[in-house]
Amino acid sequence: MEIIKNGKVFTKNFTFEKADIILDKGEIKDIIYFGNNGDSTNNSSDISGSTDANNNKSDNNYTRIIDANGLMVIPGLVDIHFHGCVGSDFCDATLEAVEKMAEYEKEHGIAAICPATMTLPKQRLMEICRNAKEYKDIQMNTKSLEKNNEQVNTSEKLKAKLVGINLEGPFISPDRVGAQNPEYVQKPDAEMLQELIDESGNMVKLVTIAPERGGAIECISKLHDKVRFSVGHTMANYDEATLAYESGAKHATHLYNAMTGLNHRNPGVVGAARDAKNVTAELICDGVHIHPSVVRATFSMFGSDRVILISDSMRACGMPDGESELGGQVVIKKGNEARLVTGELAGSVTNVYGCMVKAIEFGIPIADAIKAATY
């Protein structure tokens, strides 16, 4: 077993408490919190296999000891919307691409990923879904081997977990494609979406949709119990977006970007998402897509419970400056920006850990920023 000692641990109550964390085969087995007098007390009865706190006083019990004195210990981050990194893209539809992405993300503190597709032809999306299912099956088999104490390649443990697919296209507005290819935009189609869900083995978790498009509301009403619909890449006004949320949509794709903006007379998608109950909103906090003042305003409007930090990173993330590609389109990475040759922003080149750090730099309380990147 291993132990992380003396750290300020981010708890399920979104506060920091001094504690020791005991790990067994890379998983948390127990958390030993310290009382006001500095003595350790076991407050982790909800974690199976709890260890007597008194047994943790000897360092000889552990194969590895990490002294986190003066440091914060936080959960692994989650990125529910990114396309790629280190030269690979989810839409490459290869096991190698997903593996490289998962390795990079884990190296940067991201424990779980839900990578996004682009607006592409149906058959290409089917290939991407099949590839994700195959990768997930391999991932689950590895987990089964670990539980049975069978030999597992150590590298298998050093990858972020693939938890779903974010279908960012093709059911979007041709007038708000952003960096997507307008050639492959389609009207919302419940039958096609069901095929993609089936092909993925129910791995499709998020679906971006433009609610003003014909068939959108019907699609949301029919399938909202199977996937989480996200309003985005849309020209929808406040009323159209509100109808989508009333019909079962529960999310907003990269708030402010590729949608109608917030105006004092025309509140658009932003206003509708704010007013709808239980709707979460993505925020690309890379210092490029959103002004720091708007980041602060968004946390104030929505609250940390409803803001989800995302990276929306593309394959140039983690790579040197130069030419790259996104959805079949040429992208130029320069510094902390990635743009199409036309000048349109083409995703980010910052991972979600970097986005969390930016949020803190912009004045978001540390606990709120961590919460928005983990829960």
Q: Where is each model-derived feature located?
A:
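N-terminal metal-binding scaffold of metallo-dependent hydrolase/deaminase domains
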Residues: M1-S40, S44, D52
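His/Asp/Glu-enriched, well-ordered alpha-helical/loop segment
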Residues: G271-A281, G287, F299-S311, C317-Y375
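Active-site gating loops and adjacent loop-to-helix segments of metal-dependent hydrolytic enzymes
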Residues: Y104-C114, S173-G201, Y245, A249-L255, ...
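Divalent metal-dependent hydrolysis catalytic cores, especially in the metallo-beta-lactamase
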Residues: H83, E99-N131, A160-S173, S200-E212, ...
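Intrinsically disordered, low-complexity terminal tails and inter-domain linkers enriched
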Residues: G35-T63, D137-K159
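Active-site core of metal-dependent hydrolases
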Residues: D198-M319
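Active-site metal-binding motif and surrounding structural segment of the metallo-beta-lactamase
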Residues: G38, D59-I74, D198
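Alpha-helical scaffold segments that flank or form the walls of functional sites
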Residues: L71-M72, I80, F90-A160, Y184-E199
